[in-house]
């Protein structure tokens, strides 16, 4: 079974979506690192971890409540999903596939479900989500990317048009091509 997140009394209180299909591109830095690839703690929105399919909830509802765990566990939270399917294979460390079935634990919602798949070909990644459902109040979203923006003048490119407006929000219909401030295309 999948452990949905490791949350302790003094650590990771907002990490409940880490196992909802997170995938962060690490391609920059010398050596390549999370920091060099756009991750910074300051400004990070834990509701939008790259790759995750998650509920649209206010930040106040994100903090884990670990007071009601069983007496044997102590002050920690390691909730198990009732889904047991997750796995992947690779070919020569270059091409591969990973898939998982997501079911959020009943403590937080219990009705959020999805099937997620990633296909890795050369320098391309194809991410697919299907059978996404949620019976609880509020919407569901899948986050493509979240990067630290060191300079607001670094453009996001949407369908070939540079966007320097910050913050920026748009709803795109049909096919779209996005390029983040680190030159990763989606």
Go through the PLM ranges and name each one:
Residues 1-175, 179-185:
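Catalytic and substrate-binding regions of extracellular carbohydrate-active enzymes
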């Amino acid at each position: 079974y999948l452990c949905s997140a490791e949350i302790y009394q003094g650590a990771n209180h907002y990490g409940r979506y880490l196992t909802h299909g997170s995938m962060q591109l690490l391609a920059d830095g010398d050596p390549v690192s999370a920091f060099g690839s756009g991750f910074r703690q300051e400004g990070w929105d834990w509701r939008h971890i790259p790759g995750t399919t998650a509920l649209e909830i206010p930040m106040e509802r994100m903090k884990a409540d670990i007071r009601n765990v069983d007496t044997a566990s102590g002050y920690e939270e390691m909730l198990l999903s009732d889904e047991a399917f997750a796995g992947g294979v690779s070919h020569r460390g270059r091409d591969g596939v990973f898939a998982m079935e997501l079911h959020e634990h009943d403590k937080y919602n219990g009705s959020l479900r999805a099937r997620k798949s990633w296909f890795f070909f050369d320098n391309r990644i194809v991410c697919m989500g299907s059978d996404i459902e949620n019976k609880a109040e509020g919407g569901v979203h899948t986050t493509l990317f979240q990067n630290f923006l060191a300079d607001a003048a670094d453009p996001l490119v949407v369908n070939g048009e540079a966007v320097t407006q910050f913050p920026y929000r748009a709803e795109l219909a049909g096919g779209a091509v996005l390029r983040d401030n680190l030159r990763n295309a989606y």
